[in-house]
């Protein structure tokens, strides 16, 4: 609903400031196309992320995403704490 109001508001602004009807049509068409492309990009990004997580052919791929450089300094402390128990 917000997108519809945004498009109508932009159309009103276009009607107010445009020089001719053709310019208004072109501006509205461009705005609608831009919003549609943005929505499609967001949806495709979400679908791509879902596909990677659920249909992962390589089971170790998720472990490659871990930032080992951030974790490695803590490993000795974890081993030391686990060894004291």
UniProtKB/Swiss-Prot annotation:
GO cellular component: extracellular region
Residue ranges the record assigns to the propeptide: 19-57
Compartments it resides in: Secreted; Target cell membrane
Alanine amide, modified sites: 82
Span of the signal peptide: 1-18
Alphabetical UniProt keywords: Amidation, Antibiotic, Antimicrobial, Immunity, Innate immunity, Membrane, Secreted, Signal, Target cell membrane, Target membrane
Origin: domain of life: Eukaryota
Tissue specificity note: Expressed in entodermal epithelium along the body column.
UniProt keyword Secreted present: yes
Family statement drawn from the similarity comment of this UniProt entry: Belongs to the arminin family.
Function: Antimicrobial peptide with a broad-spectrum antimicrobial activity. Keeps its antibacterial activity under a wide range of salt concentrations that mimic physiological conditions of human blood, which is surprising, since Hydra is an obligate freshwater animal with nearly no salt tolerance. Does not affect red blood cells.
Protein name (record): Arminin 524
